[in-house]
Regions:
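Conserved short alpha-helical segments that host acidic/polar catalytic motifs at enzyme active sites
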Residues: 1-134
């Protein structure tokens, strides 16, 4: 199953990216197909050569604010859907002028993803897309 790492403060607090990166590396064993980090309306993905947090942190120059209320990290292990940028987590939708309105991720496969895809007329090869319509 996938691995989720999150940091949340009651209000924006000083954020230590080095500590968060260290925790993300421990989460690598839960993924293997893609990684991602989301905060403050921005989402950064690592796929292919950057599909481990170790490589993602070294090769992907993702920037995080020093003061931030929430950060989500996700290491994806492929279940339904291809291992690609469209299925990487965290996922965002409801775009606003400055970033996404909603950001989320999940651990595991939705057991009724085929029924949801039919009901909402979405591609059932991409189970993460179904979340946008629930």
């Amino acid at each position: 199953m996938c691995g989720i790492t999150a940091w949340a403060g009651k209000s924006p607090k000083h954020f230590n990216k080095l500590e968060f990166d260290t925790i993300l590396k421990f989460n690598d064993s839960r993924g293997g197909d893609s990684v991602g980090v989301a905060t403050d309306g921005e989402i950064y993905y690592g796929i292919d050569k950057n599909k481990s947090y170790e490589n993602f942190i070294i090769n992907q120059n993702y920037l995080l604010p020093q003061v931030v209320p929430t950060v989500i990290g996700h290491a994806r292990r492929q279940s339904v859907g291809l291992a690609n940028i469209h299925n990487a987590h965290p996922f965002g939708f409801g775009e606003l002028d400055e970033g996404f309105h909603f950001i989320g991720c999940h651990n595991g496969t939705l057991t009724n993803h085929i029924e949801l895809a039919k009901k909402y007329n979405v591609d059932n090869n991409v189970n993460d897309e179904n979340n946008k319509f629930i």
